[in-house]
């Protein structure tokens, strides 16, 4: 993937990650304090933003496939632990989200709480990942001008 494509994917992923995080928090809150209709609206918004996050997340991983290959060869360094944690959390949150969608006929399972807790952890790891790589994103932006 060329620099312009990587930059577009990274910015899009950042935007949908924020949307996914916010809709997830509002969805959780709506489950405690609002009507089913309000909860349902937040659920739809969260699912749409999550599907977009999955799409742009997959493109982001594809663009940085070299990092995963070097990880398997034991040649990563520095900021790798945050990226590894982020990757694992992304998989866990995605899996618990899919399980919850498959279990819509079973209300009040513990999976929802796990999804929420791991989602918050994913948000923290994402912020750390973005902060550690912010300068790289800015360099990429200036390189495509």
Describe each model-derived feature in a short phrase:
Residues 1-145:
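Membrane-embedded alpha-helical bundles that constitute the cytochrome b-like, heme-associated redox core
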